[in-house]
Amino acid sequence: MAQQHLKFAIFGNEYQAKKSASIMQILSYLEKREAEVYIESLFYDFLTKVEHLEVQAAGVFEDYNFDVDYVISMGGDGTFLKAASRVGAKGTPILGVN
């Protein structure tokens, strides 16, 4: 039987460039554990086009079109609330990293 990999959605704040190192640590950790990582499109654009980071992701999502096991919110209260509003009634656990 094939092992199922956990799926994560990541939301972030594109105004907090100083957190780029922490973001890359989290992405590296998840990649080593063969997790599927999906990144919110605005945050992905920030990481790749503004910060010029090489980000490995299974996909990029907008709005509510993601189906994951966990959500990681990288930022403050506003980012967490944005993630919570997108999760809605799905009941997906959210980990907030400030």
Predicted segments, located by residue:
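Active-site-adjacent beta-strand anchor residues
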Residues: 12, 40, 73-74
